[in-house]
């Protein structure tokens, strides 16, 4: 969007939920939907016929040559850094075919500064990481990006048959009685979520910070994307629905059968499902991404742009791990020898502490010598 004062580009401001001019600082407040307003679903069949492709604003598609991620940017942007790998990317002048347009989103509401503070607060509790990582300024530049997600709603008719077990307790024993059961269940599938990014569909780090409910969503607002990159979905609507049925629907159907039969377990369960009134939402979910540089490696960081929930990969302190193992082994060895030394059990703890201190001193001396040798090897010869 162009500024009414100077004609420069306006970008989304996380702190104010509005637009700010990059040149003159003019601001425009965006309209917030009433709290509790739910975003409706879109018809699945209509989307498969090509309807619902208007994003309300032109976007340009670019694929990072380093990591392969596909992203959508504002047309005014000429170059950017990839939010996923940090590589420099140059945008082409052609507008993109963006496919199906989103109808819901969660706008960024947590600022970069807030995420940074939260990260260093989390990091202090990373006991198993090296002290320099826990207490040092290791967090790289945080980059915002919207990640694509699909949600599905449908009316399901489940026809099932199988053997269902009912467990009863008789004293200390349990007995399971099996009965053949069959039936038809009518059930509503509500807001079943599938990640639309092939890159992150199985990424535990990202998925741990992107959970949301229907009450978190607002109708898609093009202005909230101003200056913000969005990853292009690489798992399309049809594929996402097939994945939901093939990989995730079995547990949901099994729970429905248990609820209908009140059974405790099952055997040889067979079922078929018919779905009606299938609808979807295409949701843009905000995420802050960064990397922590430590020991020549980069450890990924992800945080929710909605509630600040965060997670990251961390290095493991070998010294701490070895020390803990050594203490455990020392206590075990002392426990074995105490009967032969005619020592009272009360001496076990002091002896374990002494053994630990001796071992720690030897370990630190060895580690110091090793580091000195490595430093000497790096020094250039005269």
For each predicted feature, which ranges?
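Short Cys/His-rich micro-motifs in 6-15 aa windows
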Residues: 25-32, 86-94
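Short cysteine/histidine-rich zinc-coordinating motifs and their immediately flanking basic loops
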Residues: 15-20, 33-39, 75-81, 94-100
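Cys/His-rich metal-chelating microdomains
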Residues: 7-9, 27, 69-70, 88
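Short cysteine-rich clusters marking metal-coordination/redox-active sites
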Residues: 3-6, 21-24, 64-67, 82-85
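Charged, low-complexity helical/coil segments in non-catalytic cytosolic or luminal regions
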Residues: 56, 100-297, 318-319, 323, ...
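Hydrophobic alpha-helical transmembrane segments
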Residues: 341-352
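Extended hydrophobic
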Residues: 281-332, 356-359, 363
